[in-house]
Amino acid sequence: MDVNAKRGVKHVTAEWQMPQILDSLAKALNGTGPALRFAEQSNPSLESVPENIAVVVATSGSAGKAKQIGLSAAALFSSARASNDYLGAAPGDTWSLLLPLTHIAGVNVLVRSLELGREPIDLRNTTLETIPTADFTAIVPTQLHRAVNESGFLLRHLQSAHRVLVGGAMLSGELRKSATDAQLQVTATYGMTETSGGCVYDGIPLEGTEVEIREGRIAIKSTCLASYYLPTRPGETITPITDSDGWYLTNDLGHFDDGRLVVVGRIDDVIISGGEKISLRAVEEFLTPLVDGEVVAFTHPDAEWGERLAIATTASIEVDHWQELQSKIRISLGRHAIPQDIYRIAEIPRGALGKVDREKVLRTIKSKESR
């Protein structure tokens, strides 16, 4: 692909209504209009993109580094068709939109809807008193947690759907059971902007997607892979997403269990403290069921340990209870996995799709300590 052949870019703003968004997206996908950029902030320096790029999605990424990802119409259509086929969606079926369009998961709902010939039911900021029904929808675990614990409008809407896709962050077994108990038909998805969103459903790669494990890391080859990382500022260059063989090596760790992909964390979730490897996610998953609140594990620099393990929690943990928890961690995860500091915070900071923002957790705690 000639990256020097260009097409213009139009930034989608919050003022755009659904008919305008769908019309512009259709033209971007069929090549009769400019590419569309979905992002929370505009980027005047991005005036054009390679001619095969139909959509640009800006994301901070899990590590907090700003990225602009260019996706082709072929990749987006491949993703939409594979998803609709997996779900058994047919022309005339409807999707509801409960996710922001500044994220690939929201954009995917639009492309799937275009494929089915129906405008999605836009429920992002709904004030409707009646409960609209949709055949399919997509949400993040935070929304699912609120639905099954608070009931109300969202739960009833999800119960009306044939299938609810849940992605953007890890879906715990406990939350999945709660969803099943609430009569929700849930499918856990795995993917990222680089893969046009979810490309693995309930551990099984969608049509056109291959998954390998390379030294513990998840590698993906797919017809739905994005094309390029685009410049975020002047002077940066366009970088291909894949290697020369068409594989995208993620920063996620995983393995296969009975033919299904199991995601166990991220490379940056594993830290070294005192020479010992510690999985932050393992610490979180172990402690969360044992306390009355949420738990996030994180680290901060330490002269002695290199990285000092700590947790922040919304729970109130008494001294005796903490000593009991330390003993349980020692037995199950090892002495090195015992957090050396514990902080109580009112709320766990999360991104727009519900992912825990560890850097913001640390900033919040530092801010409290400096007062």
Please annotate each region the language model reported:
Residues M18, Q41-A58, A90-T94:
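Conserved pre-ATP/AMP-binding loop-to-beta segment of ANL
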Residues L29, P34, A73-S79, T94-R146:
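AMP-binding/adenylate-forming
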Residues N52-R81, G88-A90:
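Conserved AMP-binding A3 loop
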Residues S62, G168, G191, D252, ...:
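Active-site glycine-centered loops adjacent to acidic/histidine catalytic or metal-binding residues
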Residues N149-D202, E212:
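Gly/Ser/Thr-rich phosphate-binding loop
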Residues P205, R214-G246, R266, E276-I278:
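Conserved ATP/PPi-binding loop(s) of AMP-dependent carboxylate-activating enzymes
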Residues S222, N251-A337:
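AMP-binding/adenylate-forming catalytic core of the ANL superfamily
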Residues L333-K355:
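AMP-binding/adenylate-forming catalytic domain of the ANL superfamily
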